[in-house]
Amino acid sequence: MWRVKKLSLSLSPSPQTGKPSMRTPLRELTLQPGALTNSGKRSPACSSLTPSLCKLGLQEGSNNSSPVDFVNNKRTDLSSEHFSHSSKWLETCQHESDEQPLDPIPQISSTPKTSEEAVDPLGNYMVKTIVLVPSPLGQQQDMIFEARLDTMAETNSISLNGPLRTDDLVREEVAPCMGDRFSEVAAVSEKPIFQESPSHLLEESPPNPCSEQLHCSKESLSSRTEAVREDLVPSESNAFLPSSVLWLSPSTALAADFRVNHVDPEEEIVEHGAMEEREMRFPTHPKESETEDQALVSSVEDILSTCLTPNLVEMESQEAPGPAVEDVGRILGSDTESWMSPLAWLEKGVNTSVMLENLRQSLSLPSMLRDAAIGTTPFSTCSVGTWFTPSAPQEKSTNTSQTGLVGTKHSTSETEQLLCGRPPDLTALSRHDLEDNLLSSLVILEVLSRQLRDWKSQLAVPHPETQDSSTQTDTSHSGITNKLQHLKESHEMGQALQQARNVMQSWVLISKELISLLHLSLLHLEEDKTTVSQESRRAETLVCCCFDLLKKLRAKLQSLKAEREEARHREEMALRGKDAAEIVLEAFCAHASQRISQLEQDLASMREFRGLLKDAQTQLVGLHAKQEELVQQTVSLTSTLQQDWRSMQLDYTTWTALLSRSRQLTEKLTVKSQQALQERDVAIEEKQEVSRVLEQVSAQLEECKGQTEQLELENSRLATDLRAQLQILANMDSQLKELQSQHTHCAQDLAMKDELLCQLTQSNEEQAAQWQKEEMALKHMQAELQQQQAVLAKEVRDLKETLEFADQENQVAHLELGQVECQLKTTLEVLRERSLQCENLKDTVENLTAKLASTIADNQEQDLEKTRQYSQKLGLLTEQLQSLTLFLQTKLKEKTEQETLLLSTACPPTQEHPLPNDRTFLGSILTAVADEEPESTPVPLLGSDKSAFTRVASMVSLQPAETPGMEESLAEMSIMTTELQSLCSLLQESKEEAIRTLQRKICELQARLQAQEEQHQEVQKAKEADIEKLNQALCLRYKNEKELQEVIQQQNEKILEQIDKSGELISLREEVTHLTRSLRRAETETKVLQEALAGQLDSNCQPMATNWIQEKVWLSQEVDKLRVMFLEMKNEKEKLMIKFQSHRNILEENLRRSDKELEKLDDIVQHIYKTLLSIPEVVRGCKELQGLLEFLS
């Protein structure tokens, strides 16, 4: 009994367990052979069905088959299994990406149902061969042929990795069967075939019944060998892909690796029970194929000539052939109806289809295939059994060799028409074109499968002519008739095989090209899947990172909002402190203005003092005249006057020394006061600069919050500054008018001199206290400035972080730019008006400066003139005093004798000179200089007891009057002395009172003069400070105007950027519409693909093959979205980094400037504090200075 050894196949990955294997429409074409029966039934001598019809699942009357059919069935089963392996491999690739082995084992049944195939466990696609092992001797003929179709279920595996070869084929050996009616069974090695597509099921020519199959002619063999040369079109055999897609143009590049070989029949070896495994190889040269075919035919003829068929009628009597044989004979062997190829048959059935017309233009063979339209396919030689009893020749036998050739020519001509116009290289086609070709081939195959089903149903009906033609009578003939019968049958079999080979060659070439192409497309699809999975993983990681970053940014934004609120609170506190400092400065300015008014009043009183001095000089002239008259009467008093004059010189020297010291002290005080005032002005200016710096910092913060508020605040500040300056100017005008009125009424204020002096002392004390307060205030301001510096440093740090998010707020602010533009226009108009006002103020300031210069020059000239007059008057006085002293000295020389008497008699009680009053100006000077010099001893002045005037009065009374008569002279002298004593006492008293009043007036006038000079200097400094303030205000306005212009430019640039962004948005919208259209197109294409794939599926199977397309489309969409998101996030991050860097640089520059300004302010405040500490005690009594010291401390 024959056995078939199955070696392991390995194909594409198997589907997962639990999932039904998907079945393509062409899977239904691989139907079961009809020669399957139980072991008890006998097989016929030869079958009336061809291997192609057996492959379609057609049955004869009995379930037996001939040896020829057995061998043909073995060959077709091998090719169909190759095809089914590749189809199952694609189907399983659609379900999972991991490769799992398949084990295709077709189950052969006697009914025309579809074959169920299992899964092959391996995956290496190596080609193994079938080895037929002879059964033990004595078995019956039906056991030989009946199975050994069951064992044909175990199939050969096909190598996809290398070309097939036939040099290393395993030779199948057939042992002769021991029996009465069989001579031997010759087994010829089966030649390899290509992986045949289902087209060979349709185009293989069926042989005639056994009586006609034994006739063979040399012409058919020669035609067969000639067709081999034309059929050697190369094709690639290393890639097998699904059978559901068959029609694509073959590639010339892929066709270069295909070779065809035949086995040399001389290498056949007959053995019993042997089993060998070899690899398969195709022939490479057409000459070898011709010689091999001729050798094959000769070997068959030699074997058949030695064999006999004794009992063919008996076997035919057991056979019940069906009507399918006659139908096949009609289709393939009749003269009226020629054999057609499957595409021609499809064209005949679907002649009105538009799709077929498109396929005619698109699906056609290249020029190489058109030239090689008729080719030979290597086929397996049949194991022929011979009988001792030859069968009788049939009357109704028909020779199908000619009709078979005609059908082949017809089919090749039709395939040439259908396969013309294709490009030679499939790799040049796009993916869309390949998909369209696949869809069209699927439609063709679907229609083909349906028509094949119809054909099978038609062939299932028995026909009496085929039944009559296939019957044989058990009659014995001579050896010559048997040999002729065998030759006829072999000739007819050769013709049928030649026709099938020609048709199959064309189908194999196309299927091989298609399989290789589909394998490449699957490789690309796998690569796309891997890339998509990698991109999806990357996108998932990127999305996770983005979400983490967003969470961190939200937390940081909340913290920054809290810090921003704290910064706002601190800013409010700083503004409050600034307002308090401005209030203190306003109070200080008011006090300074009061002090200036008081000094101006003192100037008026000084002028009055000058008039009084002139009156005093006139009175002194009158007194000198009276003294000359009295000198004649007071000759006796010259000696006393001389002594008094010496004492008076001593007093004069002391007085001049005191005056010089007082002048030096006053000059030092004036210098110190000037320095203090200058330092105060510098401190005020620096304080203003600090306030300006703070205003700038606050302005920058407000610019981040909103530029509109900053402009309004700056406008309000400028308005308040202008109003304050205008008020100051009005006050100055009013003060000037008041000074003029006070100058007119200065005569009325002479009576209030003492009270004014008291008020001056009190005001000095108040000023000292105020200076101390101001020092304290400056200290407090310094501490607050340090605190504000720390706060500003923190705020700057906070601003560095808040400015990152200020950009996001700026995006919202872009919407408000329209309103801001209107406001900016209005502010520009207001600023232009204010610039005009500032220009007018510049003119007024220049006029005021000119007036100040003129007044200062006038005052200096007046002061110089006054000093010259005073010096001249003092010179005259000194000359008069010197003349008086000389006159008295001459008189004293003449009367030296009377000096002793004057010294003895003039001894009245002396009085101590009173200490200088603290309320006088001299007392204040002495108390101020007490720390530097020791207290000087009191010196007798003009009105004291030690002065010369008192002694003169006493001496005059004792002066005797010399007369010729002693008694008369003594009486007259006594009378004269009494009169002189009374007169001298009166004169002395009047002189002392006048001198005292004059001394007081001189001291008061000197104090007033000094005070007025100080006032003038203070007024001049105040005016200079005001001028500087105005200049600074103008500079600030110019700076503000420049800053506003820069802000306007920036806003214009932002507006232009917005316009550009709007254009970009329009372009983006257009791109979005284009993308939506392309997306709709892609959706329609995916729907069509899904429907096409769903159409491929069997109605009994679940639609699982379209899931991978949906997954791929979804993955590609997700990858595109994530890629766009990643690019957007990257661009936004770069923009934020650039903005952050620019803001950071600006803030660092501002911080550096603010640090410098704060250092300057600290130095200024420290310098002010030191200078205020070095102020003399006279000025320390001012309350404002004391308050300032307290503030600074």
UniProtKB/Swiss-Prot annotation:
What species does this protein belong to?
A: Homo sapiens (Human)
PTM statement from Swiss-Prot or TrEMBL: Phosphorylated by AURKA.
Q: Which residues form a coiled coil?
A: 545-608, 759-868, 979-1174
As recorded in Swiss-Prot or TrEMBL, the protein's gene is named: SPAG5
Q: What is the effect of changing S974A?
A: Decreased phosphorylation by GSK3-beta. Partial loss of spindle association
This chain belongs to the protein called Sperm-associated antigen 5
> Does the keyword rRNA processing belong to this entry?
no
What role is this protein assigned? Essential component of the mitotic spindle required for normal chromosome segregation and progression into anaphase. Required for chromosome alignment, normal timing of sister chromatid segregation, and maintenance of spindle pole architecture. In complex with SKAP, promotes stable microtubule-kinetochore attachments. May contribute to the regulation of separase activity. May regulate AURKA localization to mitotic spindle, but not to centrosomes and CCNB1 localization to both mitotic spindle and centrosomes. Involved in centriole duplication.
> What tissue specificity is annotated for this entry?
Highly expressed in testis. Detected at low levels in placenta, liver, pancreas, thymus and colon.
Q: What is one cellular component GO term in this UniProt entry?
A: kinetochore
Q: Which residues carry this modification: Phosphothreonine?
A: T111, T336, T937, T978
User: Which intervals of the chain are annotated as region Interaction with KNSTRN?
Assistant: 482-850
